[in-house]
């Protein structure tokens, strides 16, 4: 089994850019950024429970890792940069925390490397379970209206919230709930030590208005890139700045 994906071919010799979206997003989330790199072959994935992979279920991060590796193998992708936002960033960090022969670099935007104490894990597990129950039972428009009131999205204005609620409400609530719990931050290892031992470049992008993840970034052994005029979803808020940042990273 492999993940649903869209492919844009590039020029021979360039490593692939493999894009992973955030929770409730899909393969199109990174397209505007990826289109700025026509020389590089690009793979845009739908994570389990999302988009064309909505019917694919996993139990944990190990299941996601297996699917991701199988998908890369199926496209004969042997040299690649892994680029992920939020949930996609956590998937990318989990995947990269184990030896991966073909990985040329890791780029994460607003992804959490893992909780560091049992109390925080329990609180997160309870929180994610409550959200999952709402995704299963309530109209998605109402759930997402509340979802985007969370502190991490504080930089959004009313119009931005309304647009995101409309976009995300196209999802399947039951499959979102399953993925939310399977990849809960409560079930994720603290990846800081394993990522520090990596043998590839690790770049971390963060919106300047995203105070929570700016603080988290300081705990990582990664090159930090602040994206101006952006909150948690930097590539949506300021795609031009993210494109410029990626161009600089990929040219180095």
Curated annotation (Swiss-Prot):
Keyword Transmembrane: no
Alphabetical keyword list: Lyase, Menaquinone biosynthesis
Domain of life: Bacteria
EC code: 4.2.99.20
Pathway: Quinol/quinone metabolism; 1,4-dihydroxy-2-naphthoate biosynthesis; 1,4-dihydroxy-2-naphthoate from chorismate: step 3/7; Quinol/quinone metabolism; menaquinone biosynthesis
GO molecular function, one term: 2-succinyl-6-hydroxy-2,4-cyclohexadiene-1-carboxylate synthase activity
Family indicated by similarity: Belongs to the AB hydrolase superfamily. MenH family.
Chain's role: Catalyzes a proton abstraction reaction that results in 2,5-elimination of pyruvate from 2-succinyl-5-enolpyruvyl-6-hydroxy-3-cyclohexene-1-carboxylate (SEPHCHC) and the formation of 2-succinyl-6-hydroxy-2,4-cyclohexadiene-1-carboxylate (SHCHC).
NCBIfam families per UniProt: menH_SHCHC, PRK11126.1
Protein name as annotated: 2-succinyl-6-hydroxy-2,4-cyclohexadiene-1-carboxylate synthase
Lineage: Bacteria, Pseudomonadati, Pseudomonadota, Gammaproteobacteria, Enterobacterales
Gene name in the database record: menH
């Amino acid at each position: 089994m492999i993940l649903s994906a869209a492919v844009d071919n590039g020029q021979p010799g360039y490593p692939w850019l493999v894009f992973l979206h955030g929770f409730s997003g899909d393969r199109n989330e990174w397209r505007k950024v990826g289109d700025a790199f026509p020389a590089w072959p690009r793979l845009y994935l739908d994570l389990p429970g999302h988009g064309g992979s909505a019917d694919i279920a996993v139990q944990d991060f190990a299941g996601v890792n297996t699917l991701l590796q199988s998908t890369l193998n199926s496209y004969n992708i042997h040299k690649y940069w892994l680029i992920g936002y939020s949930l996609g960033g956590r998937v990318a960090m989990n995947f990269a925390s184990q030896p991966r022969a073909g990985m040329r670099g890791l780029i994460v935007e607003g992804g959490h490397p893992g909780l560091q104490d049992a109390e925080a894990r329990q609180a997160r597990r309870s929180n994610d379970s409550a959200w999952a129950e709402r995704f299963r039972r309530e109209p998605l428009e109402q759930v997402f209206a509340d979802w985007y009131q969370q502190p991490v999205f504080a930089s959004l204005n009313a119009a931005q919230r309304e647009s995101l609620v409309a976009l995300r409400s196209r999802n399947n609530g039951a499959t979102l709930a399953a993925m939310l719990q399977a990849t809960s931050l409560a079930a994720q290892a603290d990846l800081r030590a394993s990522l520090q031992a990596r043998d590839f470049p690790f770049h971390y992008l963060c919106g300047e208005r995203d105070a929570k993840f700016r603080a988290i970034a300081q705990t990582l052994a990664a090159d930090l890139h602040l994206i101006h005029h952006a909150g948690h979803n930097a590539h949506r808020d300021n795609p031009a700045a993210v494109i410029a940042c990626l161009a600089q990273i990929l040219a180095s």
